[in-house]
Swiss-Prot record:
Classification via Pfam families: RimP_N
Cellular compartments per GO CC: cytosol
UniProt-listed InterPro entries: Ribosome_maturation_RimP, RimP_C, RimP_C_sf, RimP_N, RimP_N_sf
Example GO BP: ribosomal small subunit assembly
Biological source species: Nitratidesulfovibrio vulgaris (strain DSM 19637 / Miyazaki F) (Desulfovibrio vulgaris)
Keywords: Cytoplasm, Ribosome biogenesis
Localisation: Cytoplasm
Name of the coding gene: rimP
Stated name of the protein: Ribosome maturation factor RimP
Broad class of the protein's primary localization: cytoplasm
Length: 226
C-alpha cells in the first residue's frame, strides 16, 4: 500500500477513536525507511478547555509495534495519547492495515506543529514558519526551503514573507504559492527574551576583560591572550 492510501486508511480509523476520547486528529506522518513509523498527531478540539494534567512526557505503549510520544503542551493529556495509541494499534492490527513491521507514535503537534492542511495555517497568520516547496520557486533558482512569516491565507494560496531576498541588493518580498506546491511546513516557536534589564534600561551584558596596567617600565599584559 502506497503512502497516501495508507495515510487515508489510518486516518479513517484514528478519527472516530480520537473523537470518542474528546480530541481531534491533527495529521499523520508516514516515515518509510527500514521499519515504518506511523506518527499520529492529535490536538484538543477547538473551544475545549486546557486539561489540568497536561505535561511533557514520554510513555511506551503496551501493544507490540506501538510506541508513544506523550508530549502534551497543547491541551491533550498523556492519558488520552496513551489510550488512543493502544486502541489505534489494536485496530490497525485487527484490520491488517499495515502488512510490514511498524512503530506507532501518538503525540500532540507540539510548539513547532506541522501543518497538513492550509486551513490549519489560518490561526497562525503573522507567525514564523519553515516550509519546503515541492519544486524551487521561479524567483529563487535552486531554492526550495524557506524560513518566513505567514502573510495571509486565501483559499488554497499561501502568501509568506521570506527572511531573505533572492539577491543581496533587494529587500525580501512576499511570495504566493499554491498549497499543493508545499511539500511540508511547520511552525517555528520563538522563545521570549527573558534577559533582565539592568539599571538605566540596558540589558545585562558580560563586560569585556580589560588589560592590566603594566608595571612601571614594562609592556601591557592582557590576561585574555594567556
Amino acid at each position: 500500500m502506497s503512502t497516501y492510501p495508507l495515510r487515508d486508511a489510518v486516518a479513517a480509523i484514528a478519527t472516530p477513536l480520537a473523537d470518542a476520547l474528546g480530541i481531534a486528529l491533527w495529521g499523520i506522518e508516514i516515515i518509510d525507511g527500514g521499519r515504518m513509523v506511523l506518527r499520529v498527531y492529535v490536538d484538543a478540539k477547538p473551544g475545549m478547555p486546557v486539561p489540568a494534567d497536561t505535561a511533557e512526557a514520554t510513555e511506551s505503549a503496551t501493544p507490540e509495534g506501538v510506541a508513544l510520544e506523550g508530549s502534551t503542551p497543547e491541551g491533550v493529556t498523556i492519558d488520552q495519547c496513551a489510550r488512543l495509541s493502544r486502541q489505534l494499534g489494536l485496530a490497525l492490527d485487527v484490520e491488517d492495515v499495515v502488512r510490514d513491521a511498524y512503530v506507532l507514535e501518538v503525540s500532540s503537534p507540539g510548539l513547532e506543529r506541522p501543518f497538513f492542511e492550509i486551513a490549519q495555517v489560518v490561526p497562525y497568520v503573522g507567525r514564523t514558519i519553515e516550509l519546503t516547496l515541492a519544486v524551487p520557486h521561479p524567483e529563487w533558482p535552486g531554492r526550495r526551503k524557506f524560513r518566513a512569516d505567514i502573510v495571509r491565507v486565501e483559499g488554497d494560496t499561501l502568501t509568506f514573507l521570506p527572511d531573505t531576498a533572492p539577491r543581496p541588493d533587494e529587500d525580501p518580498a512576499p511570495i504566493s504559492v499554491a498549497w499543493d506546491d508545499v511539500k511540508k511546513a511547520h511552525l517555528i516557536h520563538v522563545f521570549p527574551d527573558t534577559t533582565r534589564p539592568q539599571p538605566g534600561g540596558k540589558t545585562g551584558q558580560r563586560k569585556k576583560a580589560q588589560p592590566k596596567k603594566p608595571a612601571r617600565g614594562g609592556a601591557p599584559h592582557d590576561d585574555t591572550t594567556d
